[in-house]
Amino acid sequence: MKIDATDAVAALSELVDAGFTHDFRIQNGKLVDVSAGLAVNPAEVTVRMKLRFETEPGSGDASNIYALEIADTGVKGFLVDAL
């Protein structure tokens, strides 16, 4: 899979179009599928892609986007880490 986006919002749109529709977040130290309201076993997670978008080169302001897939269910989604 190839993402052609040049910013985080466009990248998320492309990921959703590619079937990565679930929103994952870190809550209380656990990975949670917010869309399903369930904690996810980290051993079941595969990172399919990692993207990084900086607001200005060298500024330290960046967004990391991880495209994730859960092995036992096939659920695909994304985790956004904004620095």
Roles of regions detected by a PLM:
Residues 1-83:
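Polybasic/polar functional segments that serve as interface/processing modules
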